[in-house]
C-alpha cells in the first residue's frame, strides 16, 4: 500500500526509517498514552523490527510510515480484528509536527482507501480517554464515539479508561 496526499507519502516502513521512528517513540510526551514504554537504545532495534515485519494488510496487519520531505513523521498501524471486514487503526506522530494537519491528512486518506479498496465494512480506534488530541482526530475524520470503558486497561502502573471510536463505509 503506497498512498500520496498533497503533502505526504504513506508507505510501508523501510530499513532506513529507524532513526526517524526512534525520534517519535523516544519522546515521553508521544508515548504517554500508548500501551508501551518509550523506546531506548537497548530496545529500538527490536521494536523497529516489529514495524518492518508487518508490511502487507493481506497478511493481517500493516504498519505505514507517513513521510514529509523524506522524513518519517508518523506511524499508522492497521490490523484486522476477529470481526468480519473490520480493522482497527492506530496512529502516532512526531510531536514536533503537531498542529499542522498531517495526522488528519494521512489518517483520513488511509481510512478512505481502506473502505474503497479493501472492502472494509467497519474501522475502529481504541484509545486512552485522556488522549484528547486522538479523540478529536477520530471525530474530525468522521468517526463517532461508541463506547467509554472505565478503568479497563492497566497501563504504566495505573488503570485507565478507554474510548472506542468507529465508522462504517456508509459514513463516508
Where are the regions that the model predicts?
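GNAT-family acyltransferases
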Residues: 1-96, 158-172
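Conserved acetyl-CoA-binding loop-helix of GNAT-fold acetyltransferases
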Residues: 99-116, 132-140
Amino acid at each position: 500500500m503506497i498512498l500520496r496526499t498533497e503533502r505526504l507519502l504513506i508507505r510501508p516502513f523501510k530499513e532506513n526509517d529507524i532513526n526517524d521512528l526512534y525520534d517519535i517513540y523516544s519522546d515521553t510526551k508521544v508515548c504517554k498514552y500508548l500501551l508501551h514504554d518509550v523506546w531506548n537504545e537497548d530496545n529500538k532495534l527490536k521494536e523497529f523490527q516489529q514495524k518492518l515485519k508487518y508490511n502487507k494488510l493481506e497478511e493481517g496487519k500493516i504498519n505505514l510510515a507517513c513521510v514529509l520531505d523524506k522524513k518519517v513523521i508518523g506511524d499508522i498501524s492497521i490490523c484486522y480484528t476477529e470481526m468480519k471486514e473490520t480493522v482497527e487503526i492506530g496512529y502516532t506522530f512526531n510531536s514536533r509536527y503537531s498542529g499542522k494537519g498531517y495526522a488528519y491528512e494521512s489518517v483520513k486518506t488511509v481510512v478512505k482507501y481502506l473502505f474503497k479498496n479493501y472492502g472494509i465494512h467497519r474501522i475502529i480506534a481504541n484509545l486512552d480517554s485522556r488522549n484528547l488530541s486522538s479523540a478529536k482526530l477520530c471525530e474530525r475524520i468522521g468517526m463517532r464515539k461508541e463506547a467509554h470503558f472505565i478503568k479497563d486497561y492497566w497501563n504504566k502502573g495505573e488503570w485507565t479508561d478507554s474510548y472506542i471510536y468507529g465508522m462504517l463505509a456508509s459514513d463516508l
